[in-house]
Amino acid sequence: MAILGLGSDIVEIDRIAAVISRTGDRLARRVLSDNEWRQYQSHQQPVRFLAKRFAVKEAASKAFGTGIRGGLAFNQFEVYNDELGKPGLRFLEHAQEMAQKLGVAHVHVTLADERHYACATVIIES
């Protein structure tokens, strides 16, 4: 296994809250996959949920070395948790094609949040 990419991101949770108050669910619909959208709608802390997902997806796009552009979109990354709560990442659509081209075999995700910030790190390996 070799590290193909590393990305990290930090999000100010109040900025996400401000966007939601200005634009409603537009940001959430753009960022979240269908599965994540369903979770978001019933989550006890939807702003915090969205901020953490946003941070992971930004970190993942940085690990790819591209950022969000060239056909890559936030909702093509899907954050999930295993039975122990450990976060993982699925690639959908164009992100899945890019992962295959890069030879991604393993993905490591860590995320944390405190009062004001959510942060995430993503490592992709061959």
Swiss-Prot record:
It is an enzyme of class 2 (transferase). It catalyses: apo-[ACP] + CoA = holo-[ACP] + adenosine 3',5'-bisphosphate + H(+). The keyword Lipid biosynthesis applies. One of its GO terms (molecular function) is holo-[acyl-carrier-protein] synthase activity. InterPro entries: 4-PPantetheinyl_Trfase_dom, 4-PPantetheinyl_Trfase_dom_sf, ACPS, Ppantetheine-prot_Trfase_dom. Mg(2+) binds at D9, E58. One of its GO terms (cellular component) is cytoplasm. Its cofactor is Mg(2+). It is found in: Cytoplasm. One of its GO terms (biological process) is fatty acid biosynthetic process. Its EC number is 2.7.8.7. Keywords: Cytoplasm, Fatty acid biosynthesis, Fatty acid metabolism, Lipid biosynthesis, Lipid metabolism, Magnesium, Metal-binding, Transferase. Belongs to the P-Pant transferase superfamily. AcpS family. Transfers the 4'-phosphopantetheine moiety from coenzyme A to a Ser of acyl-carrier-protein. This is Holo-[acyl-carrier-protein] synthase. It comes from Erwinia tasmaniensis (strain DSM 17950 / CFBP 7177 / CIP 109463 / NCPPB 4357 / Et1/99). The lineage of its organism: Bacteria, Pseudomonadati, Pseudomonadota, Gammaproteobacteria, Enterobacterales. The gene is acpS.
